[in-house]
C-alpha cells in the first residue's frame, strides 16, 4: 500500500477509535503538529507541537475530551497525494447533519511517516 493511502486510512481509524498509540506510531520521531486546538487543550501560547512527547500529550488529552458533536468523522473517501504531501477534508455537510469542517494537511518523510501535520478548521 502506498504511504499516503496507508496514513489516510490508518490515521482516520486510529483517531476515531481514540487509539493514541496507533496514532503516534504514524508520526516521525521529530514530527511537528500544528492545530488551533493546541492552545485550548494544552494551555500553551503556541499551536505548534514538536516531537512524540508533545504530540502524544495533545492526542491523549484531546481523545479524553470526546465525545462531542463537532466531528462526526465523516469523509467522502477522497484524498489528494502529491509526492510526499497528503490532504483530505472532513466536510461541513454529512449524511447525518453537519460537523466542523476540517482540512488535514500532512507532509510525509522518506519512511512514510508524518513529518509535518497541519490542521485547518472551518466554521461550526
List where the protein language model places each region:
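Short, low-complexity N-terminal intrinsically disordered segments enriched in polar/charged residues
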Residues: 1-29
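A solvent-exposed, acidic/Ser-Thr-rich amphipathic alpha-helical stretch
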Residues: 2, 28-80
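Short solvent-exposed loop/turn micro-motifs enriched in small/polar/acidic residues
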Residues: 6, 70-72, 98-100
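Hydrophobic pocket/interface hotspot
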Residues: 23, 31, 51, 55, ...
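Short, ordered coil/turn segments that flank beta-strands lining enzyme active or ligand-binding pockets
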Residues: 29, 95, 110
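Short beta-strand edge/turn micro-motifs at domain boundaries
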Residues: 85, 99-124
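Short beta-strand segments that buttress and anchor functional surface loops
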Residues: 87-95
Amino acid at each position: 500500500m502506498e504511504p499516503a493511502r496507508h496514513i489516510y486510512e490508518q490515521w482516520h481509524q486510529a483517531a476515531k477509535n481514540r487509539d493514541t498509540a496507533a496514532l503516534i506510531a504514524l508520526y516521525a520521531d521529530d514530527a511537528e503538529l500544528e492545530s488551533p486546538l493546541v492552545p485550548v487543550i494544552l494551555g500553551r501560547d503556541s499551536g505548534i507541537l514538536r516531537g512524540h512527547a508533545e504530540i502524544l500529550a495533545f492526542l491523549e488529552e484531546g481523545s479524553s475530551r470526546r465525545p462531542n458533536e463537532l466531528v462526526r468523522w465523516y469523509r467522502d473517501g477522497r484524498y489528494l497525494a502529491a509526492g510526499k504531501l497528503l490532504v483530505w477534508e472532513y466536510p461541513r455537510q454529512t449524511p447525518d447533519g453537519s460537523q466542523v469542517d476540517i482540512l488535514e494537511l500532512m507532509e510525509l518523510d522518506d519512511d512514510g511517516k508524518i513529518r509535518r501535520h497541519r490542521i485547518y478548521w472551518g466554521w461550526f
